[in-house]
UniProtKB/Swiss-Prot annotation:
Belongs to the OspC family. This is Arginine ADP-riboxanase OspC1. Keywords: ANK repeat, Host nucleus, Lyase, NAD, Plasmid, Repeat, Secreted, Toxin, Virulence. NAD(+) binds at H138, Q139, S140, L144, I157, N167, F183, H201, F206, D226, E320. It comes from Shigella flexneri. Its EC number is 4.3.99.-. It catalyses: L-arginyl-[protein] + NAD(+) = ADP-riboxanated L-argininyl-[protein] + nicotinamide + NH4(+) + H(+). Disruption phenotype: Host cells display apoptosis caused by strongly increased CASP8 activation. Gene3D superfamilies: Ankyrin repeat-containing domain. Signal peptide: none annotated. Its main location: secreted.
Length: 470
């Protein structure tokens, strides 16, 4: 078996273990080692080829881990009876990637059988989509790049203890478990207009910066919608209203769930190789069902421009592309779509933008307040370490509903930030709230939220409570 076959074998671990055993047997018999008389240095091409084989292997291994987590833990896959068993040890099997390929083929076969045979105009549209180039758009308020773009999955961010705003929620993790993937919007790219063509995904503005890559991943997967929330929003939420003004009936038809034959949670999923074919076939299925004749004629027009094709695809669907674990590349483009607000910079821990905007103490106090209300411990400590904040400054911070003491002791608030405020005399541990929960104090909050660390901290600094029910 050659190196390439060995690295890509599903039994790679067995091969490695077997080799280890042979080496252990051999080592005691070795009495001396010397260089051969002639030693050929590997040329640059061989070194590069070897490096690419190793990189490809590690990329596949990481993808196997991400897919194994998704297909074994996501409750929706279990409900559909398409889940796989979790690995028996820490090593994920390449079978998880093979499972993706089988599911992709299943959804392609399902829609192909439904549509057979295709008309000439349908074949023309399908060919147009398959032969189109795609770009993938990730939006964020974070500063994700210098010379290299680095985007990490929510799971990797958590594992590294990075503090940032989350766009992954409990139900995503419970039902889909795709939190070890990086998410991208999908656009048609072979046109002369400036990228990105779209700045929202499923009605959501995910950030002021668009990071665009024009290369896919051999182990990525695509869904026609958000993988968890597979409902296409009503037409008035869509971004390009001037395009939609051309049509009437289809605007009433577009809001729907996109799913396979097993019900709403049966979300079609395609590997990278099949994704354009899947996108084209499902689009044809929608067009066939539509009663909007003008929309049909527009879609099947012989001179359909790439931008118009993108408008159609991101109206009928809103495709989402997913790359396992992490994207790290020098081949990207960063586009500033709009300005970033101070609150967005704070919640994204975007220190470059924070430093641009926080030019005096007044703005620093705003940033401090935003970091406390959004429970951004890292940014709060950063502001406190770079500005001399006084008790009078803290008193000047106003909130319509909450006292600063309440916010410092609210659910999931930072003990480090609270202790800094206490040590510097910026708050008194026994100050009673005047607004929400009037008459209570920080210790009452800590006890109510069962925050043992905060209770211990407040008692250490002499906190008391008059609440007889505690």
């Amino acid at each position: 078996m050659n190196i390439s076959e060995t690295l890509n074998s599903a039994n790679t671990q067995c091969n490695i273990d077997s080799m280890d055993n042979r080496l252990h047997t051999l080592f005691p018999k070795v009495t001396s080692v010397r260089n051969a008389a002639q030693q050929t240095m590997p040329d640059e091409k061989n070194l590069k080829d070897s490096a690419n084989i190793i990189k490809s292997f590690f990329r596949k291994t990481i993808a196997a881990q991400s897919y194994s987590r998704m297909f074994s833990q996501g409750s929706n896959f279990k409900s559909l009876n398409i889940a796989i068993d979790a690995p028996s040890d820490a090593k994920a099997s390449f079978k998880a990637i093979e499972h993706l390929d089988r599911l992709s083929k299943h959804y392609i076969s399902e829609i192909r059988e439904k549509l057979h045979p295709l008309s000439a105009e349908e074949l023309n549209l399908l060919s147009l989509i398959i032969n189109s180039d795609l770009i993938f758009r990730h939006q964020s308020n974070s500063d994700l790049s210098d010379k290299i773009l680095n985007i990490k999955s929510f799971n990797k961010i958590q594992s590294e203890g990075i503090c940032t705003k989350r766009n992954t929620y409990a139900d995503d993790i419970k039902k889909i478990a795709n939190h070890d993937f990086v998410f991208f919007g999908v656009e048609i790219s072979n046109h002369q207009k400036k990228h990105p063509l779209n700045t929202k995904h499923h009605t959501v503005d995910f950030g002021a910066n668009a990071y665009i890559i024009d290369h896919d991943s051999p182990y990525g997967y695509m869904t026609l919608t958000d993988h968890f929330d597979n409902a296409i929003p009503p037409v008035f939420y869509h971004e390009h209203q001037s395009f939609l003004d051309k049509f009437s009936e289809v605007n009433k038809e577009v809001s729907r769930y996109v799913h396979g034959s097993k019900g709403i949670i049966d979300v079609p999923i395609f590997n990278t190789k099949d994704m354009k074919l899947g996108l084209g076939l499902y689009l044809i299925d929608f067009i066939r069902k539509s009663e909007d004749q003008s929309f049909k004629e527009f879609c099947y027009g012989k001179n359909l421009a790439p931008v118009d094709l993108d408008r159609i695809i991101n109206f009928v669907f809103q495709p989402e592309y997913h790359i396992p674990r992490m994207v790290s590349t020098e081949n990207f483009k960063k586009v500033k779509i709009r300005e970033i607000s101070l609150e967005e910079a704070v919640t994204a821990s975007n220190y470059e933008e924070i430093n641009k905007q926080v030019t005096n103490k007044k703005i620093a106090l705003q940033a401090l307040f935003l970091s406390i209300t959004n429970q951004k411990e890292d940014v709060a400590l950063y502001i406190l370490s770079n500005f001399e904040i006084t008790r009078q400054d803290v008193i000047s911070i106003k909130h319509e509903l909450y006292d600063i003491e309440y916010l410092l002791s609210a659910h999931n608030s930072s003990c480090k930030v609270l202790e800094y405020f206490i040590n510097k005399g910026l708050v008194d541990v026994n100050t009673k709230f005047k607004k929400t929960n009037s008459g209570d104090c920080m210790l009452d909050n800590a006890i109510k939220y069962e925050n043992a660390e905060m209770i211990k901290l407040l008692l250490k600094y002499g906190a008391t409570s008059d609440n007889k029910y505690i």
